[in-house]
Regions:
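Nucleotide-activated sugar donor-binding and catalytic core shared by glycosyltransferases
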Residues: 1-59, 70-190
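Short beta-strand segments
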Residues: 63-65
Length: 190
């Protein structure tokens, strides 16, 4: 774990006693991968995940916001033995979205993060056998991966660059105006 902040644009905070804040900007996109997840407390699974993260960290900075329980499990499995792995405390929404926006790729098991990466055009790798957000798979912004595939998939996603495909239908940022028109029309008919 690094003792100095990575040189970046917007600060992403950490609390006292954790890794120093990270600075994240889109200029860092070629250098960072980030991950989220609710880690089961299974030492064998943790060891497999740590091995994959170490492979990624050989080429990229890996920034991981972790709940203390997940941090303890992964630390016991040797997570912090790799130089380019940086662990923060859980981040607030705005700070986390800044981290996502500046990442070259995201690894997650969160359905919400799968949607947010699609909208932000950040390649997403979902570390699960399925997703409740299949539109992110069919649109091409997200890919389901196993721990065995993780390192190669992250490096490929970083090499491929930002997601350039079409956003899913109605993901144009205009939900509010559409809802307002429907509600206004409904109220006018009452």
């Amino acid at each position: 774990m690094s003792d100095t902040p990575a040189p970046r644009g917007d600060e992403v905070g950490a609390t006292e006693g954790s890794t120093p804040p990270f600075r994240v900007s889109s200029a860092s996109a070629a250098d960072d991968a980030s991950g989220t997840g609710d880690l089961a407390e299974d030492a064998g699974l943790a060891a497999e995940l740590v091995k994959a993260l170490h492979e990624v960290a050989a080429d990229l900075d890996v920034i991981i916001p972790l709940h203390p329980r997940g941090r303890a499990t992964l630390t016991a499995a040797g997570l912090l033995d790799a130089q380019n792995i940086h662990v923060t405390d859980p981040l607030g929404y705005i700070e986390f979205m800044s981290l996502v926006r500046g990442a070259a790729a995201i690894v997650t098991d969160s359905g919400g993060v799968q949607e947010e990466t699609t909208l932000l055009r950040v390649p997403c790798l979902t570390l699960r056998p399925n997703t409740e957000r299949p539109i992110t798979i069919t649109s091409g912004s997200n890919r389901l991966v196993t721990r065995d595939e993780l390192a190669a998939a992250v490096l490929k996603a970083c090499d491929d660059g930002p997601y350039a495909g079409e956003l899913p239908p109605l993901w144009d940022g205009q939900a509010g105006p559409r809802i307002a028109r429907i509600v206004t029309s409904w109220l006018a008919q009452r």
